[in-house]
């Protein structure tokens, strides 16, 4: 009989109640802030981290989950009799975590020669709940009797379509991290300039700029409309950091534009907000497939 484990990292931003419900282990990322190392999901809540960023002198930095950590985790699952382990990783282009997870399988062979557990390491090509949500769906279907191979194939198809539209209400964090110049950040904040950023296949791009906070949600929705064929047929999620009023306004406008409620409304965790800052909102949606080969039928 199969015994299947599901593993991901804390960048997935899966709420703990969902992780517990579907039997998903979430490994925390280390985050360093002003010389102190913290472990995400252990040492702070999301709201605490936002305040820590506001109070900090420097910018938070993240480190990859190591090969040794993965090897220890794999060995634990193998020792507990698991037949399969699926690890869904943060975008490989933005972290060495994916490569460490792959290389850890070689270490496991040294630690547990002849182990029979099948390990799948999957690159999500994205960040946050865009992969966390669909991983929950994959685990839910498998737990309810679905075939692992078909559920993983469906997961990959969803990841091939997912896109993010993000807006930052302050350029302070981006200035600290070097993503924008100090001069541009100061001028931008003084003029109330808010960038509208797309994140597609792990690549971020400033798609436009608006002036004033009030213009942000409409500009985000307009961008999403340009990326999909039918808003009413498009599943979506809403992400936020610390400002619940902005969250509620975006949810309200999205419900009107899409014609239905979001799949989930969630908070961005430490890994993502370390780069965007504590004042951001986002729309996650299913766009068009990027890799049509992912949809080709498997031939016998």
Positions of predicted regions on the chain:
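Mixed-charge interfacial surface used for oligomerization/domain docking
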Residues: 3-5, 11-25, 30, 93-106, ...
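Aromatic side chains
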Residues: 22, 38, 49-50, 70, ...
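Generic signature of intrinsically disordered, low-complexity segments enriched in small/polar residues
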Residues: 41, 47, 52-53, 73, ...
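Glycine-rich phosphate- or other oxyanion-binding loops that anchor nucleotides, phosphorylated ligands
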Residues: 55-58, 64-106, 148, 152, ...
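N-terminal glycine-rich anion-binding loop in soluble enzyme alpha/beta folds
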Residues: 5-69
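Glycine/charged-rich beta-loop-alpha catalytic/anionic-binding loops adjacent to active sites
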Residues: 53-55, 83-87, 111-122, 265
């Amino acid at each position: 009989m199969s015994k299947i484990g599901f593993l991901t990292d804390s960048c997935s931003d899966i709420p703990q109640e969902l992780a517990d419900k579907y039997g998903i282990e979430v490994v925390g990322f280390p985050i360093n802030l002003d010389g102190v190392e913290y472990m995400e999901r252990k040492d702070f809540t999301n709201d605490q981290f936002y305040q820590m960023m506001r109070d900090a002198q420097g910018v938070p930095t993240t480190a990859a989950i190591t090969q040794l950590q993965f090897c220890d985790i794999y060995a634990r699952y193998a020792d507990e009799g698991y037949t399969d382990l699926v690890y869904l990783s943060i975008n490989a282009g933005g972290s060495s975590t994916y490569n460490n997870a792959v290389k850890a399988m070689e270490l496991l062979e040294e630690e547990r020669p002849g182990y029979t557990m099948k390990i799948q390491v999957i690159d999500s090509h994205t960040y946050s709940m865009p992969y966390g949500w669909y991983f929950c769906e994959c685990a839910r279907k498998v737990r309810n009797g679905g075939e692992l191979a078909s559920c993983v194939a469906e997961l990959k198809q969803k990841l091939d379509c997912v896109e993010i539209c993000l807006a930052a209400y302050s350029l302070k964090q981006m200035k600290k991290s070097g993503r924008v110049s100090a001069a541009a950040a100061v001028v931008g904040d003084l003029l109330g300039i808010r960038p509208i950023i797309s994140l597609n296949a792990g690549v971020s791009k400033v798609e436009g700029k608006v002036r004033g906070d009030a213009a942000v949600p409409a500009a985000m929705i307009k961008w999403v409309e340009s990326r999909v064929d039918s808003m009413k047929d498009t599943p979506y999620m809403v992400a936020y950091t610390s400002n619940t009023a902005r969250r509620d306004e975006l949810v309200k406008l999205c419900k009107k534009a899409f014609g239905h409620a979001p799949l989930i409304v969630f908070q961005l965790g430490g890994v993502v907000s370390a780069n965007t800052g504590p004042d951001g909102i986002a729309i996650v949606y299913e766009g068009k497939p990027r890799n049509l080969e992912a949809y080709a039928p498997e031939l016998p």
